[in-house]
Swiss-Prot record:
Enzyme class name: oxidoreductase
PANTHER family: RHODANESE-LIKE DOMAIN-CONTAINING PROTEIN 7-RELATED, THIOSULFATE SULFURTRANSFERASE/RHODANESE-LIKE DOMAIN-CONTAINING PROTEIN 2
PROSITE patterns: RHODANESE_3
Role played: Catalyzes oxygen-dependent 5-hydroxyuridine (ho5U) modification at position 34 in tRNAs.
Disulfide cross-links: none
Biological process terms in GO annotation: tRNA modification
Domain Rhodanese: 124-218
Name by which UniProt lists this protein: tRNA uridine(34) hydroxylase
InterPro entries xref list: Rhodanese-like_dom (IPR001763), Rhodanese-like_dom_sf (IPR036873), TrhO (IPR020936), TRHO_N (IPR040503)
Entry superkingdom: Bacteria
SMART domains to which the protein is assigned, alphabetical: RHOD (SM00450)
Gene it is expressed from: trhO
EC number, UniProt record: 1.14.-.-
Organism of derivation: Rickettsia rickettsii (strain Sheila Smith)
Length: 247
């Protein structure tokens, strides 16, 4: 029986002084360990999704942590019968998730986590609004029943949407959701930095929620878009078999 391919996603907002210096080391290790996927590096941290054997993806993660020294890392592992990526890329970026807001300190301004097991109860409270921080083509594939869709084409448009919808957000507990946690974490940082106090986000994102809860209350509708060759996954995280999604 062939070993399943492990797909490891990890991010951390941590200050990296010279991120470019890490690229050769990570490329060399990744290629030696037959890793495929993408790792983004910036002064604000790292964000990666890569595949290989379970042992090897964890070796790469350990090296990434050793090189950057984060206090905490958000990690998610799924499995597939095949590699969902074509090759390994390690790239230097201005931001690990591009929002185009200067001097946003995610470590200093960050919302509170809601654990997947508590999410359904939390978002059904009357004073809570849910915002899906993903792009419109992702939300179209699937989202939570009560979620507001900002209809953004890119995450860079999200700050403008916030500015235009302050009345909608005023006096509410704001719950942010995204695929794996990074966009909702940065979104809560934006809102906290401009004065919103009761800001929350789904720990581990939609993928962790589906794994932990199996969507038992049917608050999630549709499938979850993913940025690899699987294109989308169902509530049990199986790849969607039909190839209807075009970008």
């Amino acid at each position: 029986m062939n070993e399943k391919i492990a797909i490891l996603s990890a991010y951390s907002f941590v200050n990296i002084e010279e991120p470019a210096n890490l690229i050769p080391k990570l490329l060399l290790l990744g290629k030696r360990k037959y890793i495929r996927g993408t790792i983004l590096l910036a002064n604000e941290g790292f964000n990666g999704s890569f595949s290989g054997s379970y042992e090897n993806v964890n070796l790469v993660l350990e090296e990434l942590i050793k090189l950057t020294g984060p206090k905490d890392v958000n990690v998610k592992i799924n499995y597939s019968d095949v590699h969902p990526f074509q090759k390994l890329k390690v790239r230097l970026k201005k931001e690990i998730i591009a929002m185009n807001v200067d001097d946003l300190n995610v470590d200093l301004f960050k919302g509170e986590y809601i654990e997947p097991k508590d999410w359904d109860e939390f978002i059904t409270k009357q004073d809570v609004i849910v915002i899906d921080t993903r792009n419109d083509y992702e939300v179209e594939v699937g989202t939570f029943k009560s979620a507001i869709n900002p209809n953004t084409k890119t995450f860079k448009q999200f700050p403008a949407w916030v500015q235009q919808n302050q009345e909608l957000l005023k006096g509410k507990k704001i719950a942010m959701v995204c695929t794996g946690g990074i966009r909702c974490e940065k979104s809560t940082s934006l809102l906290k930095s401009i004065g919103y106090n009761e800001v929350y986000h789904l720990k581990g994102g939609i993928l962790q929620y589906l794994e932990d809860t199996q969507n038992k209350n049917n608050l999630w509708q549709g499938e979850c878009f993913v940025f690899d060759d699987r294109r989308a996954v169902t509530d049990d995280l199986s790849p969607v078999e039909r190839h209807w999604l075009q970008r």
